[in-house]
């Protein structure tokens, strides 16, 4: 079973996979940013810069908005419907409809799958 920990503010952490979903602490190696609102962009930028093997994922519009807000760290841009594959998981992003570039992440692992919606538009 996939373990999920709720973050203190927004987001969740998947500790077994070292993934933060709208969550950024020094104890994760992968961060997914669902959209470019300030409450979802990684907060502790100093710890991010000191992180040596950190991967930050976002859609191209979200990455562009983050850069406009002064975000200097490298961001791996993952377009909607394309799948990223790592040794531990695959991740595919789908439109969330909240703001430009907002995404839901479908993460598949050997121990379970999760759809992280972040903020999304409902009918």
Language-model-detected regions and their locations in the chain:
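His/Asp/Glu-rich metal-coordinating catalytic cores
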Residues: 2-27, 38-123
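Hydrophobic beta-strand segment of the Class I
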Residues: 31
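Conserved G/P- and acidic residue-centered "switch" motifs that form tight phosphate/ATP-binding loops
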Residues: 35
């Amino acid at each position: 079973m996939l373990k999920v920990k709720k973050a203190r503010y927004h987001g969740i952490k998947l500790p077994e996979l070292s993934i933060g979903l709208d969550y950024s602490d020094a104890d994760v190696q992968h961060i997914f940013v669902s959209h470019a609102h300030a409450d979802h962009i990684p907060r502790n930028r100093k710890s991010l810069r000191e992180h040596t093997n950190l991967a930050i994922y976002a859609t191209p519009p979200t990455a562009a908005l983050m850069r406009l807000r002064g975000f200097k760290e490298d961001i791996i841009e993952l377009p909607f419907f394309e799948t990223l594959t790592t040794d531990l998981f695959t991740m595919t992003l789908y439109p969330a409809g909240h703001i430009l570039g907002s995404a839901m992440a479908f993460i598949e692992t050997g121990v379970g799958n999760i759809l992280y919606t972040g903020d999304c538009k409902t009918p």
